[in-house]
């Protein structure tokens, strides 16, 4: 099947077949990343603008690398260097950028739904690199790819997601993707960080304790506390949080012995993950980062409608 979307804004907007296509393409893209010369002419002549209104290390860098490895011209713009600091609106910024004829705009923005707003008004493709607490589709895809690498499948696996569910766009993309692919998703976190009606996000089980969520889990995805989105303190302190919802060698034993431990980054060591676990044999955090480049190459490729050229 072909990929028929101009934009990639949320995994919930995609079908199971489309998610499988993106993951399959990412698997093929990894061969390029293993070469001595990591470049193919697939997107030669295309222009990609990475427009980031929020800070980012992994996502922005990997989107830039992904574009360059496909031979696209990439331009990076951050909020601090844009006219947003002078009061320019998002739409005016986007319209001015579109006047320069880019093919794809990859954007991260603090406002949920901002990508839908632009997609209706711009002719170029829009890829969501994270919008508020709404979604982070590339993170969801790379999480699924990383798990598929290990188990060869996603259906039937027990996936525990632990932490600040309310403010996490990663949680929403993971829930959408994993439930669509047949995984069993279990959620745990402080009641103040569990959104009302979370069951509406997908076929999930909300657990009263962390132990219930990670008991016999195949995969544990730990989320950081999104303090920049909370506006107020939702936990007494990080030490108390870590006591009940931090992953350490002792409570990791509740999961399966070979359970995968994952984290979207940045990690707050000693809060959601102990250093022993973050650096241990169960950790797949760096594999997630590695797969992020291939996944973002696949996303750029499919929204461009190009034909893969590998020579």
From Swiss-Prot:
Catalytic activity as recorded in UniProt: carbamoyl phosphate + L-aspartate = N-carbamoyl-L-aspartate + phosphate + H(+)
GO cellular component: cytosol
Gene Ontology biological process terms, A to Z: 'de novo' pyrimidine nucleobase biosynthetic process; 'de novo' UMP biosynthetic process; amino acid metabolic process
Enzyme class: transferase
Residue sites binding carbamoyl phosphate per the record: 58-59, 108, 136, 139, 265-266
Keywords, alphabetical: Pyrimidine biosynthesis, Transferase
Residues binding L-aspartate, per UniProt: 86, 169, 224
Keyword GTP-binding assigned: no
Residue ranges that the Swiss-Prot or TrEMBL entry lists as coiled coil: none
GO molecular function (one): aspartate carbamoyltransferase activity
One Pfam family in the UniProt entry: OTCace_N
Statement: the UniProt record of this protein carries the keyword RNA-binding: no
EC number: 2.1.3.2
Functional pathway: Pyrimidine metabolism; UMP biosynthesis via de novo pathway; (S)-dihydroorotate from bicarbonate: step 2/3
Subunit architecture: Heterododecamer (2C3:3R2) of six catalytic PyrB chains organized as two trimers (C3), and six regulatory PyrI chains organized as three dimers (R2).
Job of this protein: Catalyzes the condensation of carbamoyl phosphate and aspartate to form carbamoyl aspartate and inorganic phosphate, the committed step in the de novo pyrimidine nucleotide biosynthesis pathway.
Protein family per UniProt: Belongs to the aspartate/ornithine carbamoyltransferase superfamily. ATCase family.
NCBIfam families, per database record: asp_carb_tr, PRK00856.1
Name of protein: Aspartate carbamoyltransferase catalytic subunit
């Amino acid at each position: 099947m072909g990929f028929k979307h101009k934009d990639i804004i949320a995994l919930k907007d995609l079908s199971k077949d489309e998610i499988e296509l993106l993951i399959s393409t990412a698997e093929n893209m990894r061969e390029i990343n293993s070469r001595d010369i990591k470049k193919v002419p697939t997107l030669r002549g295309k222009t990609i603008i990475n427009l980031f209104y929020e800070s980012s290390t992994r996502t922005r860098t990997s989107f830039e690398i992904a574009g360059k490895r496909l031979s696209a011209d990439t331009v990076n713009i951050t909020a601090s260097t844009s006219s947003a600091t002078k009061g320019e609106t998002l739409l005016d910024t986007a319209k001015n950028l579109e006047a320069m004829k880019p093919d794809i705009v990859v954007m991260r923005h603090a406002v949920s739904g901002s990508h839908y707003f632009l997609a209706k008004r711009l002719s170029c493709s829009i890829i969501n690199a994270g919008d508020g607490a709404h979604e982070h589709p590339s993170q969801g895809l790379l999480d699924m790819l990383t798990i598929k690498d290990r188990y060869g499948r996603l259906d039937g696996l027990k996936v525990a997601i632990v932490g600040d569910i309310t403010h996490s766009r990663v949680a929403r993309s993971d829930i959408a993707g994993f439930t669509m692919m047949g995984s069993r998703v279990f959620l745990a976190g402080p009641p103040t960080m569990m959104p009302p009606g979370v069951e509406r996000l997908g076929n999930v089980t909300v657990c009263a304790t962390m132990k219930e969520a990670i008991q016999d889990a195949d995969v544990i995805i730990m989320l950081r506390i999104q303090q920049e989105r909370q506006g107020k303190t939702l936990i007494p302190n990080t030490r108390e949080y870590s006591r009940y919802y931090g992953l350490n060698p002792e409570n990791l034993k509740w999961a399966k012995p070979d359970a995968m431990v994952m984290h979207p980054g940045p990690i707050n060591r000693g809060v959601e993950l102990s250093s022993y676990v973050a650096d241990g044999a169960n950790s797949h955090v760096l594999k997630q980062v590695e797969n992020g480049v291939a996944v973002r190459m696949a996303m750029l490729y499919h929204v461009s409608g190009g034909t893969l050229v590998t020579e």
